[in-house]
Amino acid sequence: MAWEYETFGPDGQCKLFGVNIFDYVWQTTGKRVKVQDPIYHQDHTFEVWRVEIDGQLHSFAAGEFSNCVWGFYLEKE
């Protein structure tokens, strides 16, 4: 399994899983993964989170690429 870039957006305004992900409570999994910025190809270590949306659990990796600009990654096969 690999973590692949999904989307990015400003703090408080990013759509993931069809919703604004910042409107939900993120629960840490305690895991961290290495990812690469898709534009500048810089390596980052982002935390893996879990969120419940409409009764379904979703996992994602997220962190800041730069001040208040968040990147989101999903685990893919």
Regions found by a protein language model. Give the residues of each.
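N-terminal trafficking/processing presequences and adjacent post-cleavage segments
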Residues: 1-22
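Acidic, low-complexity, intrinsically disordered interaction modules
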Residues: 16-76
